Regions:
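Bilobed "Venus flytrap"/periplasmic-binding protein-like clamshell domains
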Residues: 67, 73-95, 130, 152-211, ...
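N-terminal hydrophobic or amphipathic helices and topogenic motifs
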Residues: 2-3, 11, 19-112, 118-120, ...
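Stable alpha-helical elements in mature extracytoplasmic
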Residues: 86, 90, 109, 113, ...
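Sec-exported extracytoplasmic/periplasmic mature domains
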Residues: 95, 99, 118, 192, ...
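A ligand-binding cleft/hinge motif common to bilobed small-molecule-binding domains
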Residues: 126-138, 212-237
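Periplasmic-binding protein-like
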Residues: 71-77, 149-157, 233-273, 283-309
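Short helix-initiation/N-cap motifs at beta->coil->alpha
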Residues: 104-115, 199-211, 246-247
């Protein structure tokens, strides 16, 4: 019975009958056998069975169907339409890889992204190293493949500025992406006293951050070293701080996927067959020709950059 028909029946009963009985829905749980570790690159993870409620109408059936699917997501850096264009081919490729339905789900907002992540609502995720590290430590995810180029950030000011240390920039303006962007969190981690932190002027795009510093809109900025080399060919900037290299964005998989399926996903994303399905993703994030194999150990400790972000700790 659809929603419109249900509403008509309800109004009819309300008119003729003074009281209507309430309906109760039963719920049942399913259990899965424990996983077996089948590959040295994939650590053994715990499986938490999900419970489902028998569908009573089309809406509940649709919700149940979505819950049963393996959910693939990425941060809301793109619009829902852009996200679908970039990530849906990857989801379809992974569906064929493991023989289960994988759906791409755009989170909508950063708040929803955080909330759903902490609830364990995402099974496969592509995002930054600090998020991968957090899911590994807190949500039993394994990190499968990564962008091969390592991440290094530079805190920059115009060359003529009489500034030589980050400490001198306390309370000053910085062009940077809004947190929880990793570059911004790396910058903020340099200031122990929150009252002495720089003022972040939210700026989208590394090129716009560089331009903001060059134009004098902001005293400083934080950009990847690779981007700085491209933008600052004239040598107008001074690097006040350069971070240690760290692993780049990566795919992680959670405990609803067996160790066998996680291995299949990693192998598939590294294979030549992934070239087509991942083409738009690789182009959007300048991955190069292919991803590289990742491991949990190299991401350990990077979750600390989320320590002062609300909701994570």
């Amino acid at each position: 019975m659809n929603i419109k028909s249900t509403w008509v029946v309800f109004l009819t009963l309300l008119f003729f009958i003074p009281f209507a009985p309430s309906l109760a829905a039963d719920s049942s749980g399913t259990s899965m056998p424990p996983m077996q570790a089948i590959a040295a690159a994939i650590k053994k993870v715990a499986f938490s069975p999900s419970s489902s409620t028998p569908a009573k109408n089309d809406l509940k059936e649709h919700i149940a169907e979505q819950q049963e699917a393996i959910v693939f997501t990425a941060p809301p850096r793109e619009t829902p339409e852009q996200g679908m264009e970039i990530y849906k081919p990857v989801a379809e490729f992974l569906s064929k890889t493991i023989g289960e339905r994988v759906v791409y789900k755009h989170p909508g907002t950063w708040g929803v992204y955080r909330t759903e992540m902490l609830k364990g609502g995402y099974d496969i995720v592509f995002d930054g190293p600090h998020f991968n590290s957090y899911r590994m430590e807190k949500l039993s995810h394994n990190i499968l493949v990564k962008m091969p180029e390592r991440f290094e950030f530079a805190v920059i000011v115009l060359k003529e500025q009489k500034i030589s240390t980050v400490a001198q920039m306390a309370g000053r303006t910085f062009c940077a992406h809004a947190p929880p962007n990793l570059g911004t969190l790396v910058l903020l981690s340099q200031f122990d006293n929150p009252s002495r932190q720089p003022v972040i002027i939210s700026t989208n795009g590394w090129d716009n951050i560089y331009a903001g510093v060059a134009s004098g809109k902001c005293l400083g900025g934080v950009v990847p070293v690779a981007n700085l080399k491209k933008y600052d060919r004239a040598g107008n900037m001074k690097v006040v701080l350069k971070t240690q290299a760290m692993p780049n964005q990566a795919f992680s998989a959670g405990p609803r996927l067996s160790a066998e399926d996680q291995t299949k996903i990693a192998q598939a994303l590294l294979s030549p067959d992934a070239a087509g399905p991942t083409a738009k993703l690789r182009a959007a994030y300048k991955v190069g020709d292919s991803f590289a194999l990742a491991n949990n150990q190299e991401y350990r400790g990077l979750a600390e950059f989320l320590r002062n972000e609300w909701g994570y700790y």
